[in-house]
Protein backbone atom coordinates (compact mmCIF):
# COMPACT_ATOMS: atom_id res chain seq x y z
CA UNK A 1 0.00 0.00 0.00
CA UNK A 2 1.49 3.30 -1.10
CA UNK A 3 1.16 6.40 1.10
CA UNK A 4 1.42 9.96 -0.24
CA UNK A 5 1.50 12.79 2.31
CA UNK A 6 0.04 16.09 1.09
CA UNK A 7 -0.31 19.54 2.62
CA UNK A 8 -4.05 19.82 2.04
CA UNK A 9 -7.00 18.64 -0.01
CA UNK A 10 -6.11 20.85 -2.96
CA UNK A 11 -2.71 19.18 -3.30
CA UNK A 12 -4.35 15.80 -2.75
CA UNK A 13 -6.70 16.47 -5.64
CA UNK A 14 -3.80 17.33 -7.93
CA UNK A 15 -1.90 14.17 -6.95
CA UNK A 16 -4.97 12.01 -7.49
CA UNK A 17 -5.66 13.59 -10.87
CA UNK A 18 -2.17 12.67 -12.07
CA UNK A 19 -2.82 9.07 -11.00
CA UNK A 20 -6.18 9.19 -12.77
CA UNK A 21 -4.56 10.36 -15.99
CA UNK A 22 -2.06 7.49 -15.72
CA UNK A 23 -4.98 5.07 -15.49
CA UNK A 24 -6.63 6.63 -18.54
CA UNK A 25 -3.39 6.36 -20.50
CA UNK A 26 -3.28 2.69 -19.52
CA UNK A 27 -6.75 2.18 -20.99
CA UNK A 28 -9.16 2.64 -18.08
CA UNK A 29 -12.81 2.46 -19.16
CA UNK A 30 -14.71 2.68 -15.86
CA UNK A 31 -14.13 4.95 -12.88
CA UNK A 32 -15.56 4.22 -9.45
CA UNK A 33 -16.57 7.50 -7.83
CA UNK A 34 -17.29 8.61 -4.28
CA UNK A 35 -19.13 11.45 -2.60
CA UNK A 36 -18.40 13.49 0.51
CA UNK A 37 -15.85 16.24 0.94
CA UNK A 38 -12.68 14.18 0.36
CA UNK A 39 -12.86 13.77 -3.46
CA UNK A 40 -14.13 17.29 -4.26
CA UNK A 41 -10.66 18.65 -5.03
CA UNK A 42 -10.11 15.78 -7.49
CA UNK A 43 -13.41 16.52 -9.22
CA UNK A 44 -12.39 20.18 -9.45
CA UNK A 45 -9.18 19.13 -11.22
CA UNK A 46 -11.23 17.00 -13.61
CA UNK A 47 -13.66 19.85 -14.32
CA UNK A 48 -10.87 22.35 -14.99
CA UNK A 49 -8.91 19.97 -17.23
CA UNK A 50 -9.18 19.46 -20.97
CA UNK A 51 -9.59 15.71 -20.48
CA UNK A 52 -12.65 14.27 -22.25
CA UNK A 53 -14.58 11.73 -20.18
CA UNK A 54 -17.42 11.24 -22.66
CA UNK A 55 -16.27 7.76 -23.68
CA UNK A 56 -15.86 6.55 -20.09
CA UNK A 57 -18.30 4.96 -17.69
CA UNK A 58 -18.67 5.79 -14.01
CA UNK A 59 -20.19 3.89 -11.12
CA UNK A 60 -20.82 5.42 -7.72
CA UNK A 61 -20.38 3.71 -4.39
CA UNK A 62 -23.71 4.44 -2.81
CA UNK A 63 -26.93 6.43 -2.53
CA UNK A 64 -29.28 7.27 0.30
CA UNK A 65 -32.59 5.42 0.48
CA UNK A 66 -35.60 7.72 0.22
CA UNK A 67 -34.00 10.77 -1.40
CA UNK A 68 -35.07 11.45 -4.97
CA UNK A 69 -32.27 12.14 -7.48
CA UNK A 70 -33.46 15.76 -7.53
CA UNK A 71 -33.05 16.22 -3.75
CA UNK A 72 -30.13 18.56 -3.17
CA UNK A 73 -28.52 16.13 -0.69
CA UNK A 74 -28.87 13.04 -2.87
CA UNK A 75 -25.65 11.66 -4.27
CA UNK A 76 -27.14 11.93 -7.76
CA UNK A 77 -27.39 15.70 -7.21
CA UNK A 78 -23.92 15.86 -5.64
CA UNK A 79 -22.30 14.17 -8.62
CA UNK A 80 -24.16 16.35 -11.12
CA UNK A 81 -23.10 19.53 -9.34
CA UNK A 82 -19.49 18.51 -8.69
CA UNK A 83 -18.71 16.74 -11.97
CA UNK A 84 -21.32 15.46 -14.40
CA UNK A 85 -22.95 18.77 -15.38
CA UNK A 86 -19.56 19.98 -16.62
CA UNK A 87 -17.85 16.70 -17.53
CA UNK A 88 -20.44 14.18 -18.70
CA UNK A 89 -19.52 10.52 -19.00
CA UNK A 90 -20.79 8.09 -21.62
CA UNK A 91 -22.98 6.61 -18.90
CA UNK A 92 -23.00 7.16 -15.14
CA UNK A 93 -24.52 4.67 -12.73
CA UNK A 94 -25.69 5.19 -9.14
CA UNK A 95 -27.80 2.88 -6.97
CA UNK A 96 -31.55 3.53 -7.04
CA UNK A 97 -32.45 4.67 -3.54
CA UNK A 98 -36.08 5.30 -4.56
CA UNK A 99 -36.77 1.76 -5.77
CA UNK A 100 -39.87 0.03 -4.41
CA UNK A 101 -37.88 -3.21 -4.15
CA UNK A 102 -34.52 -2.23 -2.66
CA UNK A 103 -33.14 -5.77 -2.68
CA UNK A 104 -33.83 -5.99 -6.41
CA UNK A 105 -32.20 -2.57 -6.88
CA UNK A 106 -29.10 -3.87 -5.13
CA UNK A 107 -29.03 -6.97 -7.35
CA UNK A 108 -29.51 -4.81 -10.44
CA UNK A 109 -26.51 -2.74 -9.39
CA UNK A 110 -24.41 -5.88 -9.05
CA UNK A 111 -25.32 -6.62 -12.67
CA UNK A 112 -24.06 -3.15 -13.65
CA UNK A 113 -20.78 -3.79 -11.82
CA UNK A 114 -20.40 -7.17 -13.52
CA UNK A 115 -20.56 -5.44 -16.91
CA UNK A 116 -18.37 -2.49 -15.91
CA UNK A 117 -15.27 -3.69 -14.09
CA UNK A 118 -13.85 -0.74 -12.14
CA UNK A 119 -10.39 0.27 -13.31
CA UNK A 120 -9.89 2.97 -10.67
CA UNK A 121 -11.97 3.34 -7.51
CA UNK A 122 -12.01 6.55 -5.45
CA UNK A 123 -12.66 6.12 -1.72
CA UNK A 124 -12.93 8.14 1.43
CA UNK A 125 -12.93 6.62 4.89
CA UNK A 126 -15.30 7.14 7.80
CA UNK A 127 -14.09 7.86 11.30
CA UNK A 128 -15.28 4.35 12.21
CA UNK A 129 -13.35 2.82 9.30
CA UNK A 130 -16.26 2.46 6.91
CA UNK A 131 -15.72 2.51 3.15
CA UNK A 132 -18.73 3.29 1.02
CA UNK A 133 -21.54 2.81 3.51
CA UNK A 134 -20.08 -0.52 4.64
CA UNK A 135 -20.27 -0.09 8.39
CA UNK A 136 -18.26 -2.10 10.97
CA UNK A 137 -19.36 -5.72 10.93
CA UNK A 138 -20.12 -5.79 7.19
CA UNK A 139 -18.97 -9.15 5.77
CA UNK A 140 -15.94 -8.91 3.53
CA UNK A 141 -17.74 -11.00 0.89
CA UNK A 142 -20.66 -8.55 0.65
CA UNK A 143 -21.95 -7.35 -2.70
CA UNK A 144 -24.28 -4.37 -3.19
CA UNK A 145 -26.69 -4.27 -0.25
CA UNK A 146 -29.11 -2.17 1.77
CA UNK A 147 -27.44 -0.63 4.83
CA UNK A 148 -28.78 0.63 8.14
CA UNK A 149 -26.55 3.62 8.84
CA UNK A 150 -24.88 3.80 12.24
CA UNK A 151 -25.43 6.68 14.64
CA UNK A 152 -21.89 7.93 14.03
CA UNK A 153 -22.43 8.04 10.27
CA UNK A 154 -25.81 9.76 10.63
CA UNK A 155 -24.22 12.30 12.98
CA UNK A 156 -21.31 12.91 10.58
CA UNK A 157 -23.73 13.50 7.70
CA UNK A 158 -26.13 15.68 9.69
CA UNK A 159 -24.10 18.79 8.88
CA UNK A 160 -25.45 18.59 5.33
CA UNK A 161 -29.10 18.64 6.46
CA UNK A 162 -31.26 21.19 8.26
CA UNK A 163 -31.63 18.82 11.21
CA UNK A 164 -30.41 15.40 12.28
CA UNK A 165 -33.93 14.08 11.88
CA UNK A 166 -33.79 14.75 8.15
CA UNK A 167 -30.74 12.54 7.59
CA UNK A 168 -31.65 9.26 5.87
CA UNK A 169 -31.15 6.18 8.03
CA UNK A 170 -30.62 3.73 5.17
CA UNK A 171 -28.54 3.59 2.02
CA UNK A 172 -27.71 1.25 -0.84
CA UNK A 173 -23.98 0.64 -1.01
CA UNK A 174 -21.57 -1.33 -3.09
CA UNK A 175 -20.28 -4.13 -0.89
CA UNK A 176 -16.75 -4.69 0.28
CA UNK A 177 -16.21 -7.46 -2.27
CA UNK A 178 -17.46 -5.06 -4.96
CA UNK A 179 -14.90 -2.46 -3.91
CA UNK A 180 -12.10 -5.01 -3.69
CA UNK A 181 -12.81 -6.06 -7.29
CA UNK A 182 -11.52 -2.68 -8.52
CA UNK A 183 -8.15 -2.93 -10.24
CA UNK A 184 -6.74 0.16 -8.52
CA UNK A 185 -7.91 2.16 -5.49
CA UNK A 186 -7.15 5.70 -4.31
CA UNK A 187 -8.26 6.50 -0.75
CA UNK A 188 -8.35 10.05 0.61
CA UNK A 189 -8.16 10.86 4.33
CA UNK A 190 -7.96 14.37 5.75
CA UNK A 191 -8.12 15.70 9.28
CA UNK A 192 -7.49 14.42 12.78
CA UNK A 193 -10.91 12.74 12.97
CA UNK A 194 -9.62 10.17 10.47
CA UNK A 195 -6.33 9.44 12.30
CA UNK A 196 -7.67 6.50 14.36
CA UNK A 197 -9.30 4.90 11.33
CA UNK A 198 -6.13 5.25 9.26
CA UNK A 199 -4.04 3.71 12.04
CA UNK A 200 -6.40 0.75 12.40
CA UNK A 201 -6.66 0.33 8.64
CA UNK A 202 -2.90 0.13 8.19
CA UNK A 203 -1.52 -1.18 11.46
CA UNK A 204 -4.33 -3.21 12.94
CA UNK A 205 -5.57 -6.70 12.09
CA UNK A 206 -7.68 -7.29 9.00
CA UNK A 207 -11.10 -7.44 10.62
CA UNK A 208 -14.69 -6.79 9.63
CA UNK A 209 -14.89 -4.45 12.63
CA UNK A 210 -12.67 -2.07 10.61
CA UNK A 211 -14.01 -2.41 7.06
CA UNK A 212 -11.13 -0.43 5.49
CA UNK A 213 -8.61 -2.90 6.95
CA UNK A 214 -9.51 -5.27 4.10
CA UNK A 215 -7.54 -2.94 1.81
CA UNK A 216 -4.38 -4.48 3.28
CA UNK A 217 -5.24 -7.43 1.03
CA UNK A 218 -5.65 -5.37 -2.17
CA UNK A 219 -2.69 -5.34 -4.60
CA UNK A 220 -2.87 -1.68 -5.68
CA UNK A 221 -3.97 0.92 -3.13
CA UNK A 222 -2.67 4.49 -2.87
CA UNK A 223 -3.47 6.50 0.26
CA UNK A 224 -3.49 10.28 -0.03
CA UNK A 225 -3.24 11.71 3.49
CA UNK A 226 -2.65 15.01 5.19
CA UNK A 227 -0.47 15.27 8.29
CA UNK A 228 -3.44 15.22 10.65
CA UNK A 229 -4.86 11.99 9.22
CA UNK A 230 -1.41 10.39 9.27
CA UNK A 231 -0.59 11.57 12.79
CA UNK A 232 -0.81 8.16 14.48
CA UNK A 233 1.25 6.24 11.93
Curated annotation (Swiss-Prot):
Domain of life: Bacteria
GO BP term (any one): glucosamine catabolic process
Alphabetical UniProt keywords: Carbohydrate metabolism, Hydrolase
Alphabetized Pfam families for the sequence: Glucosamine_iso
GO MF entries: glucosamine-6-phosphate deaminase activity; identical protein binding
Listed InterPro entries: Glc/Gal-6P_isomerase, Glucosamine6P_isomerase, Glucosamine6P_isomerase_CS, NagB/RpiA_transferase-like
Catalytic residues, chain numbering: 62 (proton acceptor), 128 (for ring-opening step), 130 (proton acceptor), 135 (for ring-opening step)
GO cellular component: cytoplasm
Family: Belongs to the glucosamine/galactosamine-6-phosphate isomerase family. NagB subfamily.
PANTHER family from the UniProt entry: GLUCOSAMINE-6-PHOSPHATE ISOMERASE
HAMAP family: GlcN6P_deamin (MF_01241)
Function in brief: Catalyzes the reversible isomerization-deamination of glucosamine 6-phosphate (GlcN6P) to form fructose 6-phosphate (Fru6P) and ammonium ion.
Record-given protein name: Glucosamine-6-phosphate deaminase
Amino acid sequence: MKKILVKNQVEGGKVAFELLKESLTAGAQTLGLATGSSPIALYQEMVESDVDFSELYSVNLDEYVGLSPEHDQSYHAFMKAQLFDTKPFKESFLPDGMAEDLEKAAKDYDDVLAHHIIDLQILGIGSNGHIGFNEPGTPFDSQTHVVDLTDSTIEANSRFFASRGQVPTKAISMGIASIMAAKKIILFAYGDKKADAIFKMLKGPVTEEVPASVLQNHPDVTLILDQAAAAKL
